[in-house]
């Protein structure tokens, strides 16, 4: 299938983007447009695959786990490109690129790309709009999670106050972008449900967790407006709620019959659980490494660097 082939090629372009970004960590002279170019090509290939699959289905391809993961990775690729187009931070960009790679890799290597008929309940004009709003909001929140994690780490270390200010502003902008889309996602979801099932609310677990996610970011915006320190922690709490909404509720028996549940019957449970635990495991390791770095005297770090340069 051509769309599956294009998504596979896009996956490797995202990998090239990650590798060149890691190179930039040690060789800053390499322009950031190289990994950004790979990211843009990957996103463009995914958009082409999306249109091809739409032409085959005669409907928006956002109804199976494979299609949702491909669409999410496309949104994450766009979020990475536009976030780091002006904000040149190789380490942050590398951490953010892991998100579309993980999403697309899961789709390609664990989910079936076969075309499946769209059930009547999903054939609503509101459904593609609802999923698109949700996708773009979660993509912004995903990159925001990486930014907030690094911001919190720098604050705990007491380092780079100027960088802290820039990261705080970047995280706030990402939330300002994602929050309206998430709000529209809730509204269009209610319109879709009312149009398809004559009721805007079904007391569905995914509806509740999505509403909780909205509330978390609404609280963040309120705390930020009041200039309350520590509001950035809600970027991590919000990401936990996003992952719970996207993956976690799939393990709830009452949610498996819901139209909101995209998990495939053959999807390995451990892999889906990894979607929840993975980002926080990475965060824990990063914080531990930074804590170890803080205990190392700065003079020792400078001395080691001088010795290394002398041996070259």
Model-flagged regions — what are they?
Residues 121-132:
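Acidic/Ser/Thr-rich, low-complexity mid-to-C-terminal regulatory regions of eukaryotic proteins
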Residues 115-120, 161:
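Low-complexity, intrinsically disordered or weakly predicted helical/coil tracts enriched
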Residues 158-165:
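Cytosolic, membrane-interface loops and tails of multi-pass inner-membrane proteins
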Residues 3-117, 132-154, 166-196, 202-312:
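Hydrophobic cores of alpha-helical transmembrane segments in multi-pass integral membrane proteins
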């Amino acid at each position: 299938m051509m769309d599956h082939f294009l998504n596979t090629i896009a996956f490797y372009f995202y990998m090239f983007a990650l590798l060149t970004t890691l190179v930039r960590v040690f060789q800053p002279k390499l322009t950031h447009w190289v990994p950004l170019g790979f990211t843009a090509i990957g996103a463009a290939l995914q958009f082409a695959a999306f249109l091809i699959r739409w032409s085959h289905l005669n409907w928006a391809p956002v109804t199976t786990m494979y299609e949702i993961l491909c669409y999410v990775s496309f949104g994450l690729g766009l979020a990475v490109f536009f976030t780091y187009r002006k904000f040149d931070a190789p380490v942050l960009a590398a951490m953010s690129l892991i998100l579309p790679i993980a999403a697309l890799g899961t789709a390609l290597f664990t989910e079936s790309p076969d075309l499946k008929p769209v059930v009547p309940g999903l054939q609503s004009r509101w459904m593609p709009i609802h999923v698109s709003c949700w996708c773009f909001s979660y993509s912004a929140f995903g990159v925001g999670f990486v930014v907030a994690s690094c911001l919190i780490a720098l604050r705990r270390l007491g380092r780079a106050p100027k960088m802290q200010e820039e990261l705080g502003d970047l995280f706030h902008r990402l939330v300002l972008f994602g929050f309206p889309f998430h709000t529209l996602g809730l509204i269009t979801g209610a319109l879709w449900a009312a149009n398809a099932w004559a009721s805007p609310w079904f007391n569905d677990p995914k509806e509740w967790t999505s509403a909780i996610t909205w509330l978390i970011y609404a609280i963040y915006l309120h705390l930020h407006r009041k200039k309350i320190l520590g509001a950035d922690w809600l970027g991590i709490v919000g990401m936990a709620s996003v992952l719970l909404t996207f993956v976690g509720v799939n393990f709830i028996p009452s949610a498996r019959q819901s139209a909101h549940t995209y998990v495939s019957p053959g999807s390995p449970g451990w892999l889906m659980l990894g979607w929840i635990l993975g980002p926080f495991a990475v965060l824990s390791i990063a914080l531990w490494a930074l804590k170890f770095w803080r205990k190392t005297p700065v003079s020792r770090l400078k001395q080691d660097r001088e010795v290394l340069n002398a041996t070259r």
